[in-house]
Every structure is written in structure tokens, then in C-alpha cells.
């Protein structure tokens, strides 16, 4: 039965990769499913020879078991960490950047913007910080794309603060902090900031926000597109551990 599961998973992972590639043109990090899928299929083909190398096979099982335990625990934290606090009022709403398709918000960015709009339209006194610089293949900054989208959907431009220098989540928080403190003329630790990002990204954002001096934060997260969930949450596993170890 276990052998059948290994083969089935290998086939499913491989099909999933090609599904994303054909239907959506591929998404970042989806290649891992192709690699793992092929490895599982190859293992199924050569499993008898692999099992003959008893020491190697035993060590391999231990390594895989440890990795799976860490993976499951980490994913559980990512999945179940609180993601929405609409009731909590904040003076500033910070939207974390995502990729731009030339000048148009990507699916992920649009999800964050639509989520932000829900909050902004019922909280007239809240300012919004759009955070994100210009990435590879992007004709305008992520901040500009977000600002244009918000204005198009009825948000007064005077409520919008642009942060257009950041290139990653750590810098989103670092540079937005300067913008918020400059605008409010107050220390960030004295302000309530609500952060808008995507569901898989909340836990890591909380860690990075805290490291950058955001003491009073809450979240209002958009939902990931169902087709992208396996890739997004797998990618976030590695990104979270990178943040825990390196992003200071």
C-alpha cells in the first residue's frame, strides 16, 4: 500500500506542476513539485535496489522522517495562525507588495487590494501605506500599481502613502516604518497598524513586523487562489525558516 502511495504522489505532483505550467504559465517555486514527483517515481522503480543498501536506506528514512515532522509542524503553524481581525481599528493600513504583470496587479496583489478595500471603505479615518518597489519585468513600482488600483476603486489619493523602495518583505516593513513615522509624527510603537497580506504570508509577516519595531499589529488577510495553495504554502515553509534564521 505504501509503495502505491509513493507512486501515486509522484504522479500527482508531476501532473500538478504541468497543470500550473499549462494553465497559468507556471508560478514561482512550482518546480519543486516536478522534482519531488520525479524522485518519487524513480524511487518506486528502483526501490528494491535502494533497500538492499541497508545503512543508506536507514539513514534516508531517518532524514525524511525528521523533515516531514518539521514540515507538518511548521505548516500547521502557518495554516492556523490567526489571519483576520476586522474589528480592531487602526490608524494605518499597510498593504504588502506582490508582483505586477507589467502595469497590472497580479492575482496575489489584486487579492490583497480587494481585501484592503473592504476595510478602507468602512474606516474613513484610516490611512493606507502601499509598499513595494519595482521588480524584474515590472514597468512600474508595486506601490504605484496598488495606488492606481485603490484610486480607481474610490479611495481618496490623499489617504494613500507610497513606499516604493522595498524589494522584499523585510524591507516592506523597514521602509514603511519611516513613512508612517514621518506622516504621523509619532513613534511606530505608539501606533496601531493593520497589515494586509495573503493568508500563507501572515506568520512570517508578523515575525518581520515585530523585528522592525511594529508592536501593535493586527492582520486582515486575503485568501490564496485554491490552485496555488500547495505551491504557496510549500514555498512559505522554506521562506519562514529563512526568516527565522537569517532575516534580522
Regions found by a protein language model. Give the residues of each.
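Membrane-embedded alpha-helical segments of integral membrane proteins
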Residues: 1-47
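Short hydrophobic alpha-helical membrane-anchoring segments
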Residues: 16-21, 44, 70-79, 244
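Membrane-interface helix-boundary motifs at transmembrane edges
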Residues: 24, 46-59
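Transmembrane helix-loop junctions in multipass membrane proteins, especially transporters and channels
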Residues: 25, 79-83, 247-248
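Juxtamembrane membrane-interface segments at transmembrane alpha-helix termini
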Residues: 42-50, 101, 176
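Internal/C-terminal transmembrane anchor helices
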Residues: 55-77
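A structural signal for short, hydrophobic/glycine-enriched beta-strand patches
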Residues: 73-234
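A transmembrane-helix-recognition feature enriched in membrane-embedded lipid enzymes
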Residues: 229-248
Amino acid at each position: 500500500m505504501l509503495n502505491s502511495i509513493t507512486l501515486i504522489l509522484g504522479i500527482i505532483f508531476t501532473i500538478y506542476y504541468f497543470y500550473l505550467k499549462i494553465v497559468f504559465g507556471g508560478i514561482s517555486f512550482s518546480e519543486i513539485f516536478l522534482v519531488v514527483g520525479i524522485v518519487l517515481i524513480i524511487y518506486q522503480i528502483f526501490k528494491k535496489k535502494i533497500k538492499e543498501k541497508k545503512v543508506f536506506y536507514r539513514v534516508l528514512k531517518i532524514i525524511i522522517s525528521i523533515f516531514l515532522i518539521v514540515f507538518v509542524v511548521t505548516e500547521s503553524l502557518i495554516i492556523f495562525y490567526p489571519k483576520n481581525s476586522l474589528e480592531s481599528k487602526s490608524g494605518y493600513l499597510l498593504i504588502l507588495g506582490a508582483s505586477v504583470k507589467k502595469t497590472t496587479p497580479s492575482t496575489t496583489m489584486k487579492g490583497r487590494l480587494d481585501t484592503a478595500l473592504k476595510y478602507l471603505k468602512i474606516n474613513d479615518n484610516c490611512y493606507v501605506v502601499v509598499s513595494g518597489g519595482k521588480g524584474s519585468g515590472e514597468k512600474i513600482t508595486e506601490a504605484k500599481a496598488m495606488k492606481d488600483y485603490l484610486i480607481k476603486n474610490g479611495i481618496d489619493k490623499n489617504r494613500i502613502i507610497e513606499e516604493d523602495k522595498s524589494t522584499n518583505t523585510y524591507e516592506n516593513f523597514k521602509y514603511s516604518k519611516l513613512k508612517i513615522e514621518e506622516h504621523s509624527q509619532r513613534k511606530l510603537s505608539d501606533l496601531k497598524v493593520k497589515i494586509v497580506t495573503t493568508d500563507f504570508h501572515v506568520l512570517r509577516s508578523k515575525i518581520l513586523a515585530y523585528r522592525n519595531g511594529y508592536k501593535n499589529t493586527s492582520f486582515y488577510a486575503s485568501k490564496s487562489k485554491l490552485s496555488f495553495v500547495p505551491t504557496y504554502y510549500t514555498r512559505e515553509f522554506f521562506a519562514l525558516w529563512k526568516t527565522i534564521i537569517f532575516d534580522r
